């Protein structure tokens, strides 16, 4: 499908689109659910979970949180790499942030570490089937931008902009893991201590840090790593407990432990390279 040119990029009220969605039955469904729910103690309520980890762990607020991350990322890119992103690129990335999890109001959120290709396909189908209900605005240019973002960014991580948006999402995952690790380090959430340690270790055992380290052509991603270098180091330190994954099946625990070790090696090499 041919999409609009950069010169045709509309002026978008991103937060207005979100507010309209939030008031719909789909937005209300998202608002009632939390992310990283498998790590939340059963006796801890959603409000407490969100108080500890911020808006990113509310399924609805996560969309606005990602939008602000995307807005910051493109602004930093403008300063660090002028001309890398066109106005159209920036609009497509920002609208992706606002809409990317709309499908989870139909297909419940699945933890990043457990999502399969089949889960992704089901979410994509739910998104396509329900898009006319998700967005009921009558602006044709906005509708076209949403369709473009859906096809070429949200569900195509291999495209140039899809990769950039995926990096932004990974910054969000990492940031939540760092919040969890901070509570563990400070002992500020005794009602969730072991669960937050498990969450932090799960995030750090993924390839989020590795992907950011290897994305050397995106200076905004490197800038995030520099800003949070101490926090990332301390999150790895907080995840050193060898018993941290014992609640998992042995095979899963081994995979997580290996992932944590490999991510730490790559991270330490990046830090050493900066100091050389």
Short names for language-model regions:
Residues 7-25, 81-87, 91-94, 136-196:
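Histidine/acidic-rich helix-loop-helix segments that form or flank divalent-metal centers
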Residues 12-14, 156-276:
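Divalent metal-dependent phosphate-bond-processing catalytic cores, especially two-metal-ion Mg2+/Mn2+ enzymes
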Residues 15-43:
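Secretory/endomembrane lumenal or extracellular ectodomains immediately following the signal peptide
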Residues 66, 90-109, 169:
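His-Asp-centered metal-binding catalytic motifs of divalent-metal-dependent phosphohydrolases/nucleases
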Residues 110-126:
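Post-HEXXH active-site segment of zinc metalloproteases
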Residues 122-142:
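Post-HExxH zinc-binding segment in Zn-dependent metallohydrolases
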Residues 5, 9-13, 37-96:
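Alpha-helical phosphate/pyrophosphate-handling elements in metalloenzyme active cores
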Residues 78, 106-111, 138, 142-143:
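Membrane-helix exit/interface motif
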């Amino acid at each position: 499908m041919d999409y609009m040119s950069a010169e045709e990029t509309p002026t978008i009220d991103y937060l207005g689109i979100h507010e309209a969605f939030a008031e719909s039955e789909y937005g209300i469904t998202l608002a009632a659910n939390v992310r990283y729910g498998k790590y939340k103690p059963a006796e801890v309520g959603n409000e407490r979970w969100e108080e500890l980890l911020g808006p990113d762990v509310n399924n609805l607020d996560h969309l606005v949180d990602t939008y602000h991350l995307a807005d910051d990322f493109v602004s930093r890119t403008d300063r660090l790499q002028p001309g890398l992103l066109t106005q159209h690129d920036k609009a497509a990335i920002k609208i992706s942030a606002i809409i990317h999890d709309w499908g989870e109001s139909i297909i419940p959120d699945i933890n990043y570490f457990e999502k399969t290709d089949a889960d992704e396909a089901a979410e994509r189908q739910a998104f396509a089937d329900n898009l006319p209900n998700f967005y009921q605005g009558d602006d044709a240019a906005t509708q076209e931008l949403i369709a473009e973002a859906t096809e070429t960014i949200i569900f195509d991580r291999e495209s140039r902009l899809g990769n950039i948006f995926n990096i932004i999402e990974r910054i969000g995952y990492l940031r939540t893991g760092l919040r969890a690790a901070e509570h563990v380090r400070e002992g500020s959430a005794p009602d969730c201590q072991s669960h937050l340690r498990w969450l932090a270790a799960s995030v750090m055992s993924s390839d989020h840090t590795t992907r950011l380290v290897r994305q050397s052509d995106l200076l905004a991603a490197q800038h995030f790593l520099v800003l949070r270098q101490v926090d990332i180091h301390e999150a790895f330190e907080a995840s050193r407990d060898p018993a941290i994954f014992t609640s998992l099946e042995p095979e899963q625990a081994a995979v997580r432990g290996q992932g944590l070790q490999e991510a730490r090696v790559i991270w330490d090499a990046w830090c050493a390279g900066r100091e050389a």
